[in-house]
Design a protein with these regions (language model features):
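Solvent-exposed loop/turn segments at secondary-structure junctions
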Residues: 78-81, 100, 106-107, 119, ...
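Positively charged n-region of N-terminal signal peptides that target proteins for export
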Residues: 1-4
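Catalytic-core environment of secreted peptidases
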Residues: 61-79, 97-107, 131-207, 227
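A non-catalytic alpha/beta surface segment that caps or lines the substrate-entry region
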Residues: 82-138
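Second-shell loop/turn segments in exported
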Residues: 53-61, 77-87, 119-124, 168-179, ...
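Acidic/histidine-rich catalytic neighborhood of metal-dependent amide-processing enzymes
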Residues: 126-131, 159, 170-266
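Active-site-adjacent substrate-binding region
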Residues: 249-377
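N-terminal hydrophobic or amphipathic helices/low-complexity stretches enriched
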Residues: 25-98, 102-107, 378
């Protein structure tokens, strides 16, 4: 009996040893994770998200140094006055494209036909086509992203003249203020919006128009052949257009803001607030003032604002050169333009068009200045 008891004890201890040893082996054996990428995913999730920029931080990215560099190149002799259909105009478009892409923004050309009007000897040979160039940043709101805010400036000028020149000069017209200034501002505003990517509720389209000097052909082409919303383009989905044309001659405490509420009381309110912030104590409303790329949008009953610092003696002459630009003022105007567009992009409600005061704008190329003083002071 005693032998059986001892044998049973030995067998029991042996079984216990095997069980314990198996458990230890299982604990020591390498375990395959359920998801082989689980650890990588965990590490990625631990990474801190890139902090979102504030509007003030985005505004600070707009600086006079970059503006000056862009104006100087766009208004250089190399581009020969950026005449639509000519080589210099295409170089300007490619330059803008590279700048947009530098900010990781998708960019597209929109080609259209042009006809020359009374071409001079230096402008008689050129393509029958030119192009707008644009980028866009989709809105983050599931509903409002289909509402489109356009920020525009024309990139073309008048080449060598002479038919477009005030004095019939047959020399390069560099077009620094008209409109390398607005184009440089457009590039800087693209950078600011790119820095705020993912924070704009509405989709913003940033577009450099061509053939403005030939009768607003670039903007007319766009309003009749819209590209947005993507997949279902509709000009009626466009809620605001900001146009910047000749914004390089800002004087001390003065500016001119056309259509500052004449097309929309909502826009007028935003402009009033920003004008106080930027010490633009006075602005000018000229109901029905056309002559630049906002006019085709206005005639489609889209609220507009037109930033412009006035005509001057160098307008459409070979003396409109980069060294005459007020770059501190250009920086101020560009920052103002960005904040204006940003406010409209993120407004709770769509800005309303003032149908009661609608008078169709003409497309005459005088910037509506016949009734406007060239200096607007407090």
């Amino acid at each position: 009996m005693k032998k059986l008891y001892v044998a049973a004890m030995i067998v029991g201890l042996a079984i216990l040893f095997l069980v314990v040893n198996k458990e230890k082996t299982a604990l020591l054996a390498p375990q395959e994770p359920e998801n082989p990428f689980e650890e990588i995913i965990k590490q990625e999730n631990k990474k801190e998200e890139k902090p979102k920029l504030t509007v003030a931080e985005a505004v600070s990215k707009i600086d006079r140094i970059s503006l000056k560099e862009n104006v100087e190149y766009l208004a250089s002799n190399e581009l020969e006055g950026r005449m639509s259909g000519k080589k210099g105009n295409k170089i300007a478009a490619d330059f803008i494209k590279k700048r947009f892409e530098k900010y990781d923004l998708a960019t597209e050309y929109d080609k259209f036909s042009i006809k020359r009007i009374n071409p001079g000897p230096k402008n008689e040979i050129g393509d029958d086509f030119t192009q707008n160039i644009y980028t866009w940043i989709e809105g983050n709101d599931l509903v409002l992203k289909d509402e489109i805010v356009v920020i525009g400036a024309h990139m073309d000028h008048i080449g060598y003249g002479p038919s477009y020149s005030r004095y019939g000069s047959n020399r390069i017209h560099n077009g620094a203020d008209d409109n390398a200034s607005g184009t440089a501002a457009l590039i800087e505003i693209a950078e600011a919006f790119a820095a705020m990517k993912g924070q704009n509720k509405r989709t913003v389209v940033i577009m450099a128009f061509s053939a403005e000097e030939m009768g607003l052909k670039g903007s007319l082409h766009y309003v009749n052949n819209p590209k947005f919303p993507k997949g279902n383009p509709d000009i009626k989905k466009h809620v605001f257009m900001l146009n910047m044309d000749m914004i390089g001659y800002l004087g001390k405490s003065k500016t001119a803001v056309f259509d500052d509420g004449s097309s929309s009381p909502d826009i007028g309110f935003i402009i009033k607030q920003l004008s106080e912030k930027y010490s633009f104590a006075k602005s000018v409303t000229l109901r029905g003032s056309g002559g630049s790329d906002h006019a085709p949008f206005y005639n489609k009953k889209i609220p507009v604002a037109f930033l412009h610092t006035g005509l001057h003696d160098y307008y459409h002459t070979p003396k409109d050169t980069a060294d005459r630009i007020n770059y501190d003022g250009l920086e101020k105007m560009t920052r103002y333009g960005f904040e204006l567009a940003w406010n409209v992009c993120n407004a709770v409600e769509r800005v309303e068009f003032d149908y009661g005061s609608f008078t169709e704008m003409d497309y005459s190329h005088d910037h509506g200045q016949k009734d406007m003083p060239l200096e607007v002071t407090p």
